Amino acid sequence: MSPTPSPITQQDVPQPRSISLHEAFLFWLKLGFISFGGPAGQISIMHQELVERRRWISERRFLHALNYCMLLPGPEAQQLATYIGWLMHRTWGGVIAGVLFVLPSLFILIALSWVYIAFGEVPVVAGLFYGIKPAVTAIVVQAAHRIGSRALKNGWLWGIAAASFVAIFVLNMPFPLIVLGAAVIGFFGGRLAPEKFRAGGHSAAKKSFGPAVIDDDTPTPEHARFSGWKLARLAIIGAILWTLPMAMLTALFGWEGTLTQMAWFFTKAALLTFGGAYAVLPYVYQGAVGHYAWLTPTQMIDGLALGETTPGPLIMVVAFVGFIGGYVLQVFGPDQAFVAGAVAATLVTWFTFLPSFLFILAGGPLVESTHNELKFTAPLTAITAAVVGVILNLACFFGYHVLWPKGFEGQLDWPSLLIAMVAGVALLRFKRGVIEVLIGCGLIGLVVHLMF
């Protein structure tokens, strides 16, 4: 029997050293290539690397920043990386962290989107996607279950979720209107029955991993202190960064041009992503598929599958939407289809993520001014409940197009149903990872497609 190791004392833990911007740059670049697993997996990777291993930031400060990011529209993991980069190395540190979190996935998705559109009808590729599509349906069901089990804590919140499902599934109400309605209910409900709308949030840290570069008692650095002048300057810069490319697109292609409408549409989408990418996908479907016809329902499902299997935020599926729209509509002419797709993917990524940077750089000093619980979470609690109903509607939408590819008048696709059931059991019962489920179902689909 081996001797019991002696406990690690404070003296045994090496003291943290200052981190250069170059060292941080290399870490954020690495993170951009390994950030698989959706927001939960990405936040877990950052916690392991930055809190436990490198000790760049204490757990309490890490969770305090995460609580703020959870309140914002947009991808919380990317915003958390931006926040920590900003806190450590000022504005450029935040920009570098946020950009590198997204950039690798943008390049990867542009390449995969081109492979998909160019070779999607090849039997091997078609077979893989035949199995992946039912798996994506199961993944969306799992997302509704995961968010619902965390968010629907009482009858009020269950009622909001049910009402949102009816509103979008039966009444076909626009997603922004559902979000607004839920926020109003949460605003008044938080005052009438505050115990029903109390957000869970992330609990305060109870474990220490040793001293950190940014520790619990580390004073707020000068650049992270609130200043009205800094806020006004940032607002002006943000307005310029949005207005200039929008004005150029309008001048070159007109307001009704495809790229201009993509920029405007995804700006609105960026402000509605409460609850993560799954929450905004119904809005993207309503606009990109239903209104603008930039891509088909089947392509939308395939795009989500690609987004699930690449690093970076899942909301990067918008790059796929942009690429397919620009490529198929040939906005630069038939000889420049790839260039049009790549430009469209880059544009929608810019307009989708610009608000996230502004939220962090503008709100960060306000968050750093207090380490107490954030207020005004009741509307967000109600919105999260509504998101569950919206995601369930998305699962119904995917299921319909996958299981009845020719509509209800056609036959049920039994192999797809069986693959979806296998994926659901693997995800919900055996807790298997999303990527391995997609790979397994893709291989099953390939066998079925080649055999039949």
Language-model features: where?
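Multi-pass membrane proteins that catalyze or facilitate reactions on polyprenyl-/lipid-phosphate substrates
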Residues: 1-72, 76, 83-310, 314-452
